[in-house]
Amino acid sequence: MANTTITGSGVVSASDYKYVKWVGRTKGGEAVQIELPRAICRSNPDWKFEEKTEAVAEIEFEGVYTDENLAKDDRTEPWKLSGPGASESVKAIQLGVGRFYVGNTAEDAKPVGLTRGGGSFVVERSFHDINADEDPGSVEGRIWQDEGRPKLKLSALEWLDKIPTLYAGIKTVTA
């Protein structure tokens, strides 16, 4: 068997940007999915050396905008929540139970993890006001959204794929 070395590459390459999807169910059993059409894993490798299998690995992907869309002045946030369960209350969606898919595109995405033990989906937004002299506070029509950073964090019961396909800035050398 060949000797394999995994190490940090020190660079973010085009192949580090992925299509990411989580598929699960609501408490009522309705299907729901969260998609990040282009995302990068900003998680740091954090592996615990333990004898027990109770340790649950956690990984986080952040959705990214594309230059192509921004050139067309398309600032649509890079995430989607869809499926019959998408209209249910936020409390009904169980991010801890489902499958986690990663690929270069939606068509070639394959399951890379079975999730359990929780997770989170958050869109971190920042806004600023355009204020004129003596405005007492925010004024309708003069609030601008600067950013929207969708982040999908999942805990995996079992990883079904190899480490270099998930983390950004990782390279593999086989001798």
For the regions a language model picked out, list residue spans one by one.
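Signature of extracytoplasmic/envelope-associated structural regions
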Residues: 1-175
